[in-house]
Regions:
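Conserved SAM/SAH-binding loop
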Residues: 61-65
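Class I SAM-dependent methyltransferase SAM/SAH-binding core
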Residues: 14, 20-58
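Core SAM-dependent methyltransferase catalytic element
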Residues: 150-165
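A short SAM/SAH-binding and catalytic strip from SAM-dependent methyltransferases
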Residues: 73-92
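Conserved beta-strand signature within the Rossmann-like core of class I S-adenosyl-L-methionine
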Residues: 106-114
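A short acidic, Gly/Pro-enriched loop at the edge of an enzyme's catalytic core
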Residues: 66-74
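Conserved alpha-helix/loop element of class I SAM-dependent methyltransferases that forms part
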Residues: 1-9
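Short alpha-helix
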Residues: 127-142
Length: 165
């Protein structure tokens, strides 16, 4: 959804929290100009590199906040779910900090997901948020179109932010 299907040119993609590179199964590799997966878990990156050694993709242990490169699109799936012992307030601050970085390093847009607070179960170590709490923060970003998908997977909201300029 984040990638403009009308545009037939190749694009670069940063996969934040890539794990072992599962997102690649859903990518048309012929369309990728460059793919970079980053994660903070060494074992995941080692596995991703072994699994994808014959592809023109890169996986590295890297901190998102030290990322200097620009990418057409930034995708982040699943890293805003587990908060462990962090407070909800600190987790929300982390989510917003990540969004600021996605905005800074993406040229065309970014996507991420969060768990909705309207669930029929809750766990202390998971992070839930009402999407309306993120909307004002996202709407403050200049020249963006925001799409929220809450129907694809129960209890999750997917945010697709396209840069319009």
């Amino acid at each position: 959804r984040i990638i403009d299907k009308k545009n037939q040119s190749k694009f670069s993609l940063l996969d934040v929290g890539c794990g072992y590179g599962e997102l690649l199964k859903h990518c048309n590799l012929k369309k990728l100009k460059a793919y970079q997966g980053i994660d903070i878990v060494h074992e995941m990156i080692t596995h991703a590199n072994k699994k994808n050694k014959n592809r023109k993709v890169k996986f590295n242990v890297r901190n998102l906040f030290e990322e200097k490169n620009k990418y057409d699109y930034v995708i982040c799936n699943g890293i805003f779910t587990l908060k462990s012992t962090i407070s909800n307030k600190k987790m929300l601050t982390f989510v917003k900090r990540c969004i600021n970085q996605f905005y800074k390093i993406s040229l065309k847009g970014f996507a991420f997901n969060v768990m909705d607070e309207k669930v029929d179960f809750k766990s202390k170590d998971l992070f839930y948020i009402n999407s309306n709490k993120l909307l004002p923060f996202l709407e403050n970003k200049q020249n963006v179109k925001i799409i929220i998908d809450s129907k694809t997977i129960d209890y999750e909201n997917y945010f697709f932010i396209k840069k319009t300029k």
